[in-house]
Structures are given as C-alpha cells and as structure tokens.
From Swiss-Prot:
The keyword Oxidoreductase applies. It comes from Cucumis melo. Belongs to the iron/ascorbate-dependent oxidoreductase family. This is 1-aminocyclopropane-1-carboxylate oxidase 3. GO terms for molecular function: 1-aminocyclopropane-1-carboxylate oxidase activity; L-ascorbic acid binding; metal ion binding. PROSITE patterns: FE2OG_OXY. Pathway: Alkene biosynthesis; ethylene biosynthesis via S-adenosyl-L-methionine; ethylene from S-adenosyl-L-methionine: step 2/2. Keywords: Ethylene biosynthesis, Fruit ripening, Iron, Metal-binding, Oxidoreductase, Vitamin C. Its EC number is 1.14.17.4. It catalyses: 1-aminocyclopropane-1-carboxylate + L-ascorbate + O2 = ethene + L-dehydroascorbate + hydrogen cyanide + CO2 + 2 H2O. Flowers. Residues 154-254 form the Fe2OG dioxygenase domain. Gene3D superfamilies: B-lactam Antibiotic, Isopenicillin N Synthase, Chain (2.60.120.330).
Length: 320
C-alpha cells in the first residue's frame, strides 16, 4: 500500500480545525520526521524570485565548475558504485549569528537582497513551527527557541544545491543517506524534478514536489530534546538522468554553545520513563557529526553519552 506523505495546510490552524492540524503535525513528527507545509505565509512571488535567481546563478557561476569537477574525478565514466561522493553542486549562506553573504563574490546584489528577504521569512516560519511543536509536546511557548539560543542566538544558514542530470544515477547518489545533525530544516525544493526520498518503515518514500510548498524535517537535536518522542529520519537524494533539480535547505540550529538535553517535562513524572539521550554542547556534537554524517545516528548519541560521563567526572555542563 502506498503511503501518503503528510501535507499540512497552515491556513487550517486558524479556527475549528486547529486541533486536527496539530494532531496531523504530531503524527508526522512521531512517525515520519518530515512533513510538507502549504499556505505557510511566505509569498509565492518571493519564492518564484528565489527559484529564478538560483537557477540563473547556477547556470552563470556553478555549472561549468561542476562539469570540471566531474571530469577531474572521472565521475561521468564510472563503472562501479561510488560511495564517497555526491552528485551535487552547492554553496552555503550563513544568516545567523553573522551573515557571510558579503563574502561570497559571485552573488549579485539582487540575488543577495532576495535571499536575505527569503531567509527572514524562513526564520519566522521556523520559530512558528517550533512553537507548534511546543504546543503538541506540552512545553511552554518559546521553550525550543530558548534551548537553541545559547549565548549568541541560533545558527541559521542555507545550503543552496543543484543536482544536474547524471549519466549513471544507479551508481552515484545525488546526496547519500543521512539524518540532519541540527534542529529544524526548511526545504524549498524543485516542483518539477523529484529525487528526495525519506526512509519510512524500512522503505524509501518519495517526497512529492509541490509548487510553493516548504518541506520540514526534524534534526537530531529535536530527537534528543523530545527524548525520542520525535525522530530525525534518514533521507537521501537520488540523481536523475533528466532534469536539473534545485534544492534550497535552510537549517535553524542551536547556537554553538547551546546545551542540548531532554526536556525535563518530557522525562519527569512518567513512571519507568528514563532519560534516553545525553546532555551535551551542540558544537561538540557537530564536531563528531562531520566525520560520521553518512552513518547511523545511534553511535553518535552513544559517543555523546560517553563524553557526558567523562564530563560528569570533571564537573557539570552549565545550562544556559
């Protein structure tokens, strides 16, 4: 039986349908780790500009560079499966705590302006979604934003990716399977070329391309904070022989020095319920993740538990 990917209409949060929509979001967080938002409040005109300028920037500044990389690595003539490279062309924009847009020389002023406007809208949407999760979890409004804050506010950035046509998609992934390390991810994906797959009950399920939607997925930090009630989920991008797929993924993550641990309200007061996840500084987790991104998340959590035990012997981690 084909599973329907969860699609949430945010217009229905206003009025009598609110409880039903919150239940849909809760079910998606518990059973999928992903859901797709429509009527999310970001203007279609702005999204169309972002898409147009992103595709123009790829053609002008990134396409030739990607072809040269493919040629230098011989990726267009591989005969066996490649497991250490992704078929993607990317660059990264940092928005918070400090923007790096002025440092990226090949972005024209119009593109910078539009991406700044888009990032501002996504930041607001991320915080709105986090508060919906708080409401479902029985946490006070603003709890997740506060935990993410650290001393300088959250980390927020955007990975802009293009997945060009691939001559041998059966031998190389657009992006290998992984869970995301951070907090809340907001994806504006191509509405014509598919390729994003989510692992659901042991099967890969396609995330349907929808015009003007934003796909939400949960990172490892939300799994920790919810003590496993919500899950980060493995996902991948399949390379395609036809079509150039655009993907703009924005990551609303904890600040580097934010201390991450299961919310006490989700652990205390429940008989036989124990704290399943460790307490750690987000930056320490990221340092570990860099080398283990394309592996299962459980060994990362175990490594952080071991680090927590060592820290307990040396003294407690301060909670901001």
């Amino acid at each position: 039986m084909e599973m329907d990917f969860p699609v949430i209409n945010m217009n229905n949060l206003n009025g009598e349908s609110r409880v039903s929509v919150l239940n849909q979001i809760n079910d998606a967080c518990e059973n999928w780790g992903f859901f797709e938002l429509v009527n999310h409040g970001i203007s279609h005109e702005l999204m169309d500009k972002v898409e147009k300028l992103t595709k123009e920037h790829y053609r002008k500044c990134m396409e030739q560079r990607f072809k040269e990389m493919v040629a230098s690595k011989g990726l267009d003539s591989v005969e066996t499966e490649i497991n250490d490279t992704d078929w993607e062309s990317t660059f990264f924009l940092r928005h918070l705590p400090v923007s790096n847009m002025s440092e990226i020389g090949d972005l024209d002023e119009e593109y910078k302006k539009v991406m700044k406007e888009f990032a501002d809208e996504l930041e607001k949407l991320a915080e709105e979604v986090l508060d919906l999760l708080c409401e479902n979890l029985g946490l006070e409004k603003g709890y997740l934003k506060k935990v993410f804050y650290g001393s300088k506010g959250p980390n927020f950035g955007t990975k802009v990716s293009n997945y060009p046509p691939c001559p041998k998609p059966e031998l190389i992934k657009g992006l290998r399977a992984h869970t995301d390390a951070g907090g809340l991810i907001l994806l504006f994906q191509d509405d014509k070329v598919s390729g994003l797959h989510v692992l659901k009950d042991g099967k890969w399920v396609d995330v349907p391309p929808m015009h003007h939607s934003i796909v939400i997925n949960l990172g490892d930090q939300l799994e920790v904070i919810t003590n496993g009630k919500y899950k980060s989920v493995m996902h991948r991008v399949i390379a395609q022989e036809d079509g150039n797929r655009m993907s703009i993924a924005s990551f609303y993550n904890p600040g580097n020095d934010a201390v991450i641990y299961p919310a006490p309200a989700l652990v205390e007061g429940e008989q036989e319920k124990t704290k399943l996840y460790p307490k750690f500084v987000f930056d320490d987790y990221m340092k570990l993740y860099v080398g283990l991104k394309f592996q299962a998340k459980e060994p990362r959590f175990e490594a952080m538990k071991a680090m927590e035990s060592t820290n307990l012997n040396m003294g407690p981690i301060a909670t901001v």
